[in-house]
């Protein structure tokens, strides 16, 4: 696989070419994903739940993400590698810059932060200092205590309109990717069509430019709850490599997510 950059994703958006992405946490799986030409990987703070056994992502630290970012980069030298900025690691723009630098030094090409237009100054400061940003909207797991649980976001018209405004503001501030989680497909389609930058969805229908799954959900090995929008591709194929290939193929064709894995 050739080296993937944000320019490739922008080109694919313009061409209408959909792309698959996945979380990854170690060199072995990163190498497997690269062998199947997975273009984008995310070292997610989901590692707190799927690796560390926590009930949410809040205990994850910058050092945790940096460690796993180094591991993934060694296994996949050519992917576009995103790294989550954990809870309270970007409370101020200055703090965000300091912590983002640690993740870039660990091998990340881009950092992902959760939140709306209150992050505009942070996104501007990061991009001005050569740190690309993915803005995460919708269900932002670090806000679980504010939301009162993991709930679909953007069903009410005023909240949907607010999410559109947030997406535009973050793009204007310099965000190069927007990730939408657990939002109605119609809203995700609207945001995808309005934005110039690529939009990646999870639980947001198949109208986004890309899709992402937590790798443990893709293989059906999550310890507890399996979200409605996830699919066990290993059960369908019986082989890990074939499962990854099938996921990539189904995203590219628009077969995944289908209605059974879409939030209305």
Curated annotation (Swiss-Prot):
Question: Cofactor(s) for this protein?
Answer: Mg(2+)
Identify the residues that bind Mg(2+): 45, 84, 114
Q: Which PANTHER family match?
A: 3-METHYL-2-OXOBUTANOATE HYDROXYMETHYLTRANSFERASE
CDD domains hit by this protein: KPHMT-like
Any single Pfam family the record assigns to this protein: Pantoate_transf
Which GO terms fall under molecular function for this chain's record? 3-methyl-2-oxobutanoate hydroxymethyltransferase activity; magnesium ion binding
Family to which the UniProt record says this protein belongs: Belongs to the PanB family.
In terms of InterPro entries, this protein maps to: Pantoate_hydroxy_MeTrfase (IPR003700), Pyrv/PenolPyrv_kinase-like_dom (IPR015813), Pyrv_kinase-like_dom_sf (IPR040442)
Record note on cofactor: Binds 1 Mg(2+) ion per subunit.
Q: Where in the cell is it found?
A: Cytoplasm
- UniProt organism field: Vibrio cholerae serotype O1 (strain ATCC 39315 / El Tor Inaba N16961)
Reported function: Catalyzes the reversible reaction in which hydroxymethyl group from 5,10-methylenetetrahydrofolate is transferred onto alpha-ketoisovalerate to form ketopantoate.
The pathway to which it is assigned is:
Cofactor biosynthesis; (R)-pantothenate biosynthesis; (R)-pantoate from 3-methyl-2-oxobutanoate: step 1/2
Biological process (GO) annotations held by this record are: pantothenate biosynthetic process
Catalyzed reaction equations: 3-methyl-2-oxobutanoate + (6R)-5,10-methylene-5,6,7,8-tetrahydrofolate + H2O = 2-dehydropantoate + (6S)-5,6,7,8-tetrahydrofolate
What EC class does the entry list?
Answer: transferase
Report residues binding 3-methyl-2-oxobutanoate. Answer: 45-46, 84, 112
The EC number(s) this enzyme carries: 2.1.2.11
Q: How does it assemble?
A: Homodecamer; pentamer of dimers.
**Record's protein name:** 3-methyl-2-oxobutanoate hydroxymethyltransferase
List UniProt keywords, sorted A-Z.
Answer: Cytoplasm, Magnesium, Metal-binding, Pantothenate biosynthesis, Transferase
Q: Where is the active site?
A: 181
Task: Provide one Gene Ontology cellular component.
Answer: cytoplasm
């Amino acid at each position: 696989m050739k080296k993937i950059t944000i320019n490739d994703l922008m080109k694919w958006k313009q061409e209408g070419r959909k792309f698959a992405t996945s979380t990854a946490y170690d060199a072995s799986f990163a190498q497997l994903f690269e062998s199947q030409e997975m273009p984008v990987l995310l070292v997610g703070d989901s590692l707190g739940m799927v690796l560390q056994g926590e009930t949410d992502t809040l205990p994850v630290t910058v050092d945790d993400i940096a460690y796993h970012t180094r591991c993934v980069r060694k296994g996949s030298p050519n992917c576009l590698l995103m790294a989550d900025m954990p809870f309270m690691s970007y409370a101020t723009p200055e703090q965000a810059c300091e912590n983002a630098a640690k993740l870039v030094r660990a091998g990340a090409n881009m950092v992902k932060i959760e939140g709306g237009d209150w992050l505009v100054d942070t996104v501007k400061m990061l991009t001005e200092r050569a740190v690309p940003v993915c803005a995460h909207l919708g269900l932002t797991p670090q806000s679980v205590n504010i939301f009162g649980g993991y709930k679909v976001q953007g069903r009410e018209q005023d909240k949907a309109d607010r999410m559109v405004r947030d997406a535009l503001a973050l793009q204007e501030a310099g965000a190069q990717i927007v990730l939408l989680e657990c939002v109605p497909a119609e809203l995700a389609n609207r945001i995808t069509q309005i934005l110039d930058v690529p939009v990646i969805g999870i639980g947001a229908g198949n109208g986004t430019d890309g899709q992402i799954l937590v790798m443990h959900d893709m293989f059906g090995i999550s310890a507890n709850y399996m979200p409605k929008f996830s699919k066990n591709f290993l059960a369908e194929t019986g082989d890990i490599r074939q499962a990854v290939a099938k996921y990539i193929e189904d995203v590219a064709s628009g077969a995944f997510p289908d209605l059974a894995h879409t939030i209305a």
